Amino acid sequence: MTQSNTHNATVLVISSQVIDGQVGIQAIAPGLRAFGLGCIGLPTTLLAAHPAAYPQAGPPAGGALPAKHITEFADWLMSAGAFEELAGVLTGYMPSVEHVEATADVIDLLRAQKPDLPVCCDPICGDNDRLYLPREVAAALGKHLLPRAGIATPNLFELGHLTGTSPLEQTQDTARAAQKLNVPNVIVTSAPGPKGRIATLLVGDQLLRCETVAVPQVPHGMGDLFSALYMGLHLRRDKMALGIATSTMAKLAGKSANKKMLPNEQVELAKAALQETLSLPP
């Protein structure tokens, strides 16, 4: 896909969904729309809000949706012709092994029609030295989804857990760990940087590194939005994809520091700035 023919193209997003807030599909969709891409959101979970959004209210209503819905919905959408303009697949939060396996089945189904369909896997399983999904789910991500992906976007903790190579304190150590995933392009977020800075690495045919100012606390949903921005830039075959996505997210992080959730107005401002930078229509 070239920079001139993304119009009317869509991306299938299989991830979490909330009714209130911008995490999961809600954070990914505006990132894709910045490039004129449609978003077909297929939820793995449905919650009233992210658990951190209203801690005083207790655990949010909702939960995981049946894993069989993933294949059932995808089968129906395919028969309806909804995937005719499909440009890629982006996978995110998976609450169970069954959801991982169903998502892998959908990717295989789609690639039977479009063998070169790009797939980006955000192997969400933990952060800040804490695994927040069962170990068997993290293992299933490595067994079923990463082998089907052309792009993976783990954070530093996820990379270390998935490869059994933590702690990762040097760029070369991180790059070697990323190669163990056997994914053509691995973008590692929250990689080590000099004091007061944080790095993002692209490990593929070459090693690229972008550094930005470290923000002590960033809102939930930032990783989801980053994967969407990188996916959009990748589909445009933009050679500056890593730098553009990283700088956009750094500006957003700076303006949203110490907030628990992504502010909608800041996401829209980031979207507008990105469109202006790339000379994209609003």
Where are these regions (language model features)?
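Conserved N-terminal subdomain of the carbohydrate kinase-like
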Residues: 2-128, 267-282
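Glycine-rich beta-alpha junction loops
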Residues: 18, 45-47, 95, 125-127, ...
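Generic secondary-structure signature for well-ordered alpha-helical cores
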Residues: 37, 75-83, 108, 112, ...
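Short, electropositive alpha-helical surface patch
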Residues: 74-75, 99-111, 115, 171-178, ...
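Residue-level signal for inorganic ion chemistry
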Residues: 89, 155, 223
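Conserved phosphate/ATP/ADP-binding segment of small-molecule kinases
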Residues: 131-208, 215-217, 237-238
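Short, small-residue alpha-helix embedded
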Residues: 161, 216-244
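Charged C-terminal helix
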Residues: 239-282
